[in-house]
Amino acid sequence: MLLNSFGDLRNHRYHGLFGAIIIEPPAAQYYSNFFNRKESFSEQAVITAPGVKSFREFVLFAHNGIRLLDKDGNLIKTSEQGEDTGHGGVDHEDTGEKGFNYRSERFFNRLRRVPIVNRIFSSRTHGDPATPLLKAYTGERVIIRYLMPGDKPRNISFVLHGHNWLAQPDDPFSRRISVQGAVSAGGVYNIELENGASEYPGDYLYRSGSLKWDVESGMWGIFRVMKKGIGYCCTCVCRTFGNWWERQWFEKYE
């Protein structure tokens, strides 16, 4: 559920006054991403609940048209940097910066450090991007809460390479898609990956569907799928035992 301020539609969400309420199954427990530690809020968590298969949850806020400043306090204008004026001016709807969860990884900064285009997404060359690094184990159940608080009316899309999901989550006969289109201000999507995270460990790109303006302006990130090991098994056992113990306690003293 998207939270927005309606006191000043133009400026409040433009400067980040928004949030989300995620409604989980009854008696759900929230665990830190890769530790057996409970947390009440985070952009990544493991959710467990009685009678429900545990899942890894990611919350992504898509930003379109935000006002970002560089380290010197200057307004960033990615759409105008390196633009060929011979093709006309920049459309007003494409101005402003892009990103996820108030973080952005612009091509401009990466190419300034290492001017090799075919390595633009390489973590080995540039390090991991500033945008949320989503992590899961192979085959794990994954649900992405994707929200678009603002600010431009220009529609975007959400792409996750190497994975797909149901276009209509409640319809098992719905078509499978790997692109969620027609995302605009106020949009909320619950994306459960079919068969969970990929069985093949590695880095998978998530991004806007528009390479020009959006992706080059920083609207992309990495979904890292890792191989299951002894640490994963131990953590699962600890969570299962902890949930069982709490359930016994509540049933006894309820």
Q: Model-flagged regions — what are they?
A:
Residues 1-254:
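Copper-binding active sites and cupredoxin-like electron-transfer domains
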